[in-house]
Amino acid sequence: MKIRSPIVSVLGHVDHGKTTLLDYIRGSTIAAKEAGGITQHIGATEIPNDTIENICGDFISKLAIKDLIPGLFFIDTPGHAAFTSLRKRGGALADLAVLILDVNDGFKPQTYEALNILKMYKTPFIVVANKIDRLFGWEVHEGASFRETFSNQAKSVQQDLDNKIYEIVGELHKEGFQSERFDRVSNFASQISIIPISAKTGEGVIEVLAMLLGLAQEYLTEQLEIDENAPAKGTVLEIKEETGLGVTLDAIIYDGVLRTNDEIALMLSSEDVLVTKIRSILRPLPLEEMRDSKKKFRKLDEVVAAAGIKVAAPHLDDVVSGSPLRVLSEDTDVEQEILNEIDNITIDTEDEGILVKADTIGSLEAVVKLLREMDIPIRAADIGDVNRRDIINSSIAYDENELHGAIIAFNVDVHPNSEEDLNNSEVKLFSGDVIYQILEEYEEWVKQKQEDKKKSFYDAIIKPAKFVSLPKLVFRQSKPAIIGIESLSGTLKQGQQLINKDGHVVGSIASMEDKGETLPDISRGQRVAMAIKDAIVGKDFEEGDELYVDIPEKHYKYIEREFKDKLTEDEFETLYEFLEIKRKQDSDWGSFGLFE
């Protein structure tokens, strides 16, 4: 069995140096002009073992790395959006990952998100603490190993870096990982290695390459074994139009061999399987050749994993990014394999919930997994831009439950023809390219909606209140009774039903006035003239009596269960006076049943 190069993905927060690191690795290997050099693939860069050994020198021999691993295969598109898009059955396509962070900036939202995604896919990784050249007092040693450059720094600079490394160790510990600076790691199987580097000056990059090679050799050789004669397995990166070629697909082949004229099976956006024949397999020309040629690609008869290639074939328009790619063979029902994989990918949805849209299968799976962990129901989940059908579907969900009238859109846009539909609907769109932030915004929105709903509900509930009928201030005895009152607790509102101290209904508040002004409600301590519909002074109550707002039993239970802490002290006292009055008539009034 042949061992292929491990596929390496670089993740981290924006501006923390993902692209700079990849550019430096490519640049230094091209500049080295060693035998074999680098191979530029579609969407990836392969650095052979010989080149790494020549760059790393003695460091490789110190790690006792043998020539088991042919090289390192770096995915060119950095970031976790690319990481989740590149998937294979059972997890991420990347065998190893580099989590990069700015040593001066520490953990940022996308760092945590990348860490969660690595955790989700159980991908082995190293942490690269970048931008050591920005530490105060740092003396740059271009391209040097970390050990060499670190030993030439002032003690204060060394201490400063150590402090920052231990802050990273602390954050990783909070996230459930044991870690240490790479040269202090005692067990590479249980501790994450932190490598301080400068992607700009190249300091420490030697150790990054050597550590990746060493980890792959020590822990991944079995999963890197491939049968170079077996039908190819791969993952589609993207579908794109190329001048002179028509619609093509870019793919990473991670197992087996792919040949021109092979029949391949792919997944369509309709969740059907496309079988098509490869017309040509293409790889970019080396940079130096590209300058002297009008062509961008070189045609190949075959490629063996790991390889990043462009495929020209008929009918690729509706193939999905992230789709599995399989070569048809007599031994295996590949079409059924793809259908099985589609079944695994197809997201189980509920009758109610929010809508989820993403750019690729892998991204969709990652977003849905995170939503499931948050116990958020999903009505529909699909790949592609937000369209009119999505907005209609989400509007229906809103009518059933306004918290479900939301669309989570990761790395996709709203279709231009649907923007007006969205603006005219009640649907709330949460979109962006950082899953962590989108979900945080959604949670905040849900929380606010729930608080608003609770407040509206609380405002609508009849709450405890009472007043006293002031002596010698009876302006009319009945039809309606008009009396002078003083509010003793709570808020009295027009229309509220009133009871006396015996629990009998005396009537309802028709109106309240003060100095000729009609008042819809009054608070404790206010004195007003009150008209009480259906009440007769002297029969239903006397001057000087206290009257209570009549609270429906259902409202009392809501207050008791959910809103008791919102009552003022005087409202609280009035509630229990009112309860005593009610229980003189019915001892079970306000009691909770077994299932309440």
From Swiss-Prot:
Span of domain tr-type G: 3-220
Positions of region (G5): 198-200
Domain of life where this protein originates: Archaea
Segments of this protein annotated with the region G3: 76-79
Residues holding GTP: 12-19, 76-80, 130-133
Keyword GTP-binding annotated: yes
GO CC terms, sorted: cytoplasm
InterPro entries linked to this entry: EFTU-type, P-loop_NTPase, Small_GTP-bd, T_Tr_GTP-bd_dom, TF_aIF-2_arc, TIF_IF2, TIF_IF2_dom3, TIF_IF2_dom3_sf
Region named G4: 130-133
Coiled-coil stretches noted in the UniProt entry, renumbered to this chain: none
Renumbered residue ranges of the record's region G2: 37-41
Chain positions covered by the region annotation G1: 12-19
Example GO molecular function: GTPase activity
Pfam families membership: GTP_EFTU, GTP_EFTU_D4, IF-2
Record's function text: Function in general translation initiation by promoting the binding of the formylmethionine-tRNA to ribosomes. Seems to function along with eIF-2.
Family assignment from sequence similarity: Belongs to the TRAFAC class translation factor GTPase superfamily. Classic translation factor GTPase family. IF-2 subfamily.
Protein name: Probable translation initiation factor IF-2
Gene that encodes the chain: infB
